[in-house]
Amino acid sequence: MNGERVTAIASAIGLVLQPVFLGYFLLYNGYMLLLIALSAGQVRRRVAGHFIEDLDLIDGSDYTKPLTMVVPAFNEEVTIVDSVTNLIHCDYPRFEVVVVNDGSSDETLNVLKQAFRLRRTDLPYRDAIGTARVRAMYEATILLPKNVSQLIVIDKENAGKADALNAGINTSTSPYFVSLDADSILDQRALKELMRMVQEDPRIVAVGGQVAIANGCTIRAGRVVSVGLPSHPWARFQMVEYLRSFTTGRTGLDRLDSVLILSGVFAVFEKETVIRAGGYLTPLVQHKLVEEYVGRRAGTVCEDMEIIVRLHRFVRDKLRSRRIAFLPHPVAWTEVPEKLESLRKQRGRWQRGLRESLFYHRDMLFRRKYGRIGWFALPSFWLFEYYGPILELTGYIFVAVFLIMERIFGIPILNEQYAVAFLLASLGWGTLVNVFAVLVGAWRFRYGLADRLQRGLLPFNRKRDVLILLGYAVLENFFWRPMTLYWRLRGLWDAWRGKSGWEKFARQGFQKHVETGRAA
C-alpha cells in the first residue's frame, strides 16, 4: 500500500510539473524566436543604411549637437593614455572629453598629467547630482584637434563608476553626453551614427548600439581594421551569446520600443533628462525622484540597466512621447574575459544588478501607463532572466530524478514523449535560436545600386569563421550554458545574502590583439 501511495504521489507531481517545465522552455525559445523575427528586417535595413548614408552631412549641419565624452577611470595607468588619445581623434564636429579619475591607487592621474600636460584649474562644476568629493580639476594644455573644445580631467575620491559618471555629467557643457569605458574602442562612425538618429528623431533621450568582441580582431592605431574569431573557446562562446543578446535580443526589443539595457561600454544620453531623472544611481544621490522610485541611499552594481529602466519610468510619468533607441551594428568594441574566475565575477555581478533593477522598479509591472515596458519587457526579464536560472535548474533536476526513479524503482512518472519534447525544447530549439542569431549577425545582405554590394553586420573575412561560430552555436547549450547557469544562480545567491561590490576582474589589454587577429 505504501509503495502504491508513493507511486501515486510521484505520478501526480510528475503530471503537474511536466507541463510547467516544458511550457517554460517553449515560452522562452518562442520569445527569442519572436525577437529574431523582429530583428532580421531591422538588421537588413540598418546594414544597408550603414554603408550608404552620407554621415559627413553632420559636419556642416547647424542641427548637429555638441557632445561630452565622459570616461570613468580607475587604475587604468596602462591603457588610459592610448584610450584618451584615440578619443580626441574621433570623427565628430564638436565635442569635449572629460576623464574622471575615480580615486585610482596607481599612476593613472600622473600618466595623464605627463601625457597631456595637465594644468590645475577652477572650471565651473555644476553640482546637479550628488557625488563624492572632487579633489581637483585639470585641463590639457597640449594642442588639441580643432573639433575638440577641451580635455578635462577630474580627480575625485573613489566611489565607483556610477559616481564618476555623475561627476562627468556635472562638468559637461554639452546638451548630450556619451558614457563609455576607458578600455573600449569606438567605431570610427559611431558618434555620427548615433547622433544622426537623434537628429532624425528628437524624441530620443538615450541611444546605444551593439558592443562587439575585440578578442581576435586586428587592431591598428586604436581602430578595429579586421574582424576575426578569438582563439580562446570561452571568448567564442561569448561571441555567440553577444550576437543573441545584442543583434537579435535588443534589436527585437527596439522594434517594440522596449529596450531595457544600453551597454555601459558606449551610449549617448540627453543630459538634462538624465539630470531630471536623478543621474546614475549611487548612495550619494539625493534626489526627490530617485527617493520616490528606489528609496534613500540606494545603489546598484549595474548602473547601465537601472538608469535605462528609470528613464523609461520617468519619461512615461513626466514627459510622455520620448523614447530610447538601439542600433544593431557595432558602435564599440570591448575585450571579454577568457578566464573562468573573471567570467564568474562578471556574470555574478550582472545577475545581482539585474535583481536590483527589477526590484527597484517592480511597481512598473502590468501598469497601463508603462505600455509594452510594463506588459512585455519587464515581465519577460522577470521570468526569463531573474527566475529563469531557478526554473531551468529545477527542470533539469526534475527530469534527472524522475528518470532515475523510473529506471531503478520502476515508477513510471515520465513518458517518452515528454522526455523527447523536453530535450527538443530545452536543447534542440535553443540551439536553433543560437544558429539563427549567428546567421543574422554574419549574413551578407545586398545593398547599393541593383543590390550589387554585399555586407554583413559583422564583416568576417572568411566563411570559415562563420562556420566555426555556427559550430559553437550548436555546442553552446551543452558546454557554455551550464556554466553560465551556475554563475547566474551564484549571483542570485549572493544578492539574497546582500552581497555588494563590483569584483573588478583583470583585463589582458588590447595589446594582445594588435596586429595579431587570428581567424581560428
What spans do the regions from the language model cover?
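Membrane-interface helix-boundary signature
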Residues: E4-F21, Y370-A377, F381, E416-A419, ...
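Non-transmembrane catalytic domains and loops of membrane-associated enzymes and transporters
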Residues: V47-Y370, L383-Y386, K499, V514-A520
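Membrane-proximal soluble regions of multi-pass membrane proteins
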Residues: S342, Q346-F359, I468-G517
